[in-house]
Swiss-Prot record:
One of its GO terms (cellular component) is cytoplasm. It comes from Caldanaerobacter subterraneus subsp. tengcongensis (strain DSM 15242 / JCM 11007 / NBRC 100824 / MB4). The lineage of its organism: Bacteria, Bacillati, Bacillota, Clostridia, Thermoanaerobacterales. Its main location: cytoplasm. NCBIfam families: PRK00143.1 (NF001138), trmU (TIGR00420). Residues 154-156, 310-311 are annotated as: Interaction with tRNA. Keywords: ATP-binding, Cytoplasm, Disulfide bond, Nucleotide-binding, RNA-binding, Transferase, tRNA processing, tRNA-binding. This is tRNA-specific 2-thiouridylase MnmA 2.
Length: 364
């Protein structure tokens, strides 16, 4: 495709994507706002009111913003591919005793793959979002880099580590060099109708934040109760189904042995949740798979990095080493709490995203 200044902005009806659309228009881009219709909850009222970027209210907010700033606006249907790539993945991972991050899957398969395809269909060279991240081209490396946002408290590079060089060429992140409070101030000064709208906190398609209920309603198999066992295999009691538990969990176990117990492992094959004491939740080695690298073409030798094992975690010193099958071995300098299969581990070199992958398992 020939390079042009037409950009499709993914508009969720929130303040960030709204300001992103405005900034791009001010920079001279031909901006087309698009809200992705991705999920229809069975509870129509919940979707209308609470459904985050999936709700009918979000569509109305995005349309009002588009009218206010004077850009074209469309709603596009992504329901089928979203169900396949995000919903089914989310449910299947929990059934396997793992804890997925659906936002990472949504970014990988929907926002920066499917939306980009739609953008190209209407001859738009770029796709933009309201993510807090910076894209730069490094002449020396001959690669696009993904770097942390100026607002480190809002940085979203953790959920963007899957981006490819081709995708990065066609992506714009207008908010990367803005602080969140400045974005809100800008929205307020512009009179945008979403200026005071709170940020969404929950997973957009689980409107009541009840993961267990959502998985039961969407699973193709029955959720069966099973056994709690300790790390030596001794029976401790019964659980209500592995979908209700995640590594490091303490609340809601219903088991008392005099000392606090935590979930330290989930054996989906045998429907067993393994409980242990506080020190047994920690580990310093893991293996990741489905790895993607951004600042380098591929990991060919041992490399010292900062790594984080969940969105809210702090970066920790670690060494990463390539394995023969494309997986990566990660060794932390210090033990990490609750290394959780299904979550992602992301590697940093200063403010540059090296890459990342999905945690397969804790080694020790």
């Amino acid at each position: 495709m020939q390079k042009n200044n037409r950009v499709v902005v993914g508009m969720s009806g929130g303040v960030d994507s709204s300001v992103a659309a405005y900034l791009l228009k001010e920079q001279g881009y031909e901006v087309i706002g698009v809200t992705m219709q991705i999920w229809q909850d069975k509870d129509e009222e919940a979707v209308r009111v609470e459904g985050g970027c999936c709700s009918l209210a979000a569509v109305n907010d995005a349309r009002r913003v588009a009218n206010k700033i004077g850009i074209k606006y469309y709603v596009m249907n992504f329901k089928d591919v979203f169900k396949e790539k995000v919903i089914d993945y989310f449910v299947d991972e929990y059934l396997r005793g793992r804890t997925p991050n659906p936002c990472i899957a949504c970014n990988k398969y929907i926002k920066f793959e499917e939306l980009l395809k739609r953008a190209w269909m209407i001859d738009a060279y770029y796709v933009a979002t309201g993510h807090y991240a910076i894209k730069e081209y490094d002449e020396e490396r001959g690669r696009y880099l993904l770097k942390k946002s100026v607002d480190t408290s809002k940085d979203q590079t953790y959920v963007l580590y899957n981006l490819t060089q081709t995708q990065l060429e066609h992506i714009l992140f207008p908010l990367g060099k803005y602080k969140k409070d400045k974005v809100r101030e800008l929205a307020k000064n512009l009179g945008l109708p979403v200026a005071s709208k709170p940020d969404s906190q929950e997973i957009c398609f689980v409107t009541d934040n009840d993961y267990g209920k959502f998985i039961r309603e969407n699973a193709k198999e029955e959720i069966k109760p099973g056994e709690f066992r300790d790390t030596r295999g001794r029976f401790l009691g019964y659980h209500k189904g592995i979908i209700h538990y995640t590594i490091g969990q303490r609340k809601g176990l219903g088991i008392s042995v005099g000392k606090p117990l935590y979930v330290v492992d989930i054996d989906a094959e045998n429907n067993v949740v393994v409980l242990g004491y506080g020190d047994e939740v920690y580990g310093d080695e893991l293996i990741s798979y489905n790895n993607n690298f951004i600042s380098i073409d591929k990991l060919e030798k041992e490399m010292r990095v900062k790594a984080k094992i969940r969105y809210t975690a702090k970066e920790q010193d670690a060494v990463i080493r390539p394995l023969e099958d494309g997986r990566v071995f990660v060794k932390f300098d210090n033990p990490q709490r609750a290394i959780t299969p299904g979550q992602s581990v992301v590697f940093y070199d200063g403010d540059i995203v090296v890459g990342g992958g999905i945690i397969e398992r804790k080694v020790r």
